[in-house]
Regions:
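Glycine/charged-rich beta-loop-alpha catalytic/anionic-binding loops adjacent to active sites
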Residues: 59-63
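Hydrophobic residue at the +6 position relative to the catalytic HRD Asp in the kinase catalytic loop
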Residues: 93-97
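C-terminal catalytic region of ATP-dependent kinase domains
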Residues: 98-195
Length: 195
């Protein structure tokens, strides 16, 4: 789906039918730049002021602890991907900056650990709420249109027909809403732990 949207944020992932624990998937390893994370939890004074953030709580010294993410355009695309995929577990540690082996090692943003996606019930939990309520850009509307046009056969053997329908309904709902979703208030908005 990441490729269909034209964002290519998910590393190469392949199905493995005969793994040691049975069927599953494997994903290309990405060496993460741990010195420059795009999502951070820290004392609020140490978080970059131009980042999207909110208060998590206070520490034992009564200092405010915040969670913030970069305004990087790839994260905005990832937030849209997660909304359509219904990602129930987008933690900060699942957002990496690392070399793209297919582009001579050029650094890029990667989204890993996408195991809790495509459920038919609403389950979106993410650390990437910084664009909640912001209008969709024309290119983002085009990404959602691409999802609506995916042939069922492209999903065959990967997700169920009910999950395919749910993906399309979420894409259509976002197009009709015209903006990024926000927390519903009906369930936890953040995965735990957030990083």
């Amino acid at each position: 789906m990441s490729q269909v949207m034209g964002i290519c944020l998910v590393p190469l992932t392949v199905l493995v039918n005969d793994g040691p624990q049975g069927p599953g998937s494997m994903q290309r390893w990405i060496d993460d730049d741990v010195e420059n994370p795009l999502v951070r939890a820290d004392v609020t004074e140490r978080l970059p002021p131009h980042w999207h953030g909110f208060l998590l709580g206070v520490d034992e010294d009564d200092r405010e602890i915040g969670l913030a993410h970069s305004p990087h355009p790839a994260l905005r695309a990832l937030a849209l991907f997660d909304a359509v995929a219904n990602n129930a577990d987008r933690k900060g540690g699942h957002v990496l900056v690392g070399p793209d082996p297919d582009l001579g090692g050029t650094a890029q943003v990667w989204a890993v650990d996408n195991g809790l996606v495509f459920h038919t019930d609403p389950k979106l939990r993410t650390v990437l709420w910084g664009w909640a309520g912001q209008p969709l850009e024309p290119v983002e509307e085009m990404m959602l249109d691409e999802i609506l046009n995916i042939a069922d056969v492209d999903f065959e053997g990967l997700i169920t027909s009910d999950e395919i329908d749910a993906v399309r309904q979420r894409a259509q709902g976002l197009l009709e809403f015209g903006a990024f979703p926000g927390p519903s208030g009906l369930r936890p908005a953040l995965p735990w732990p957030p990083i």
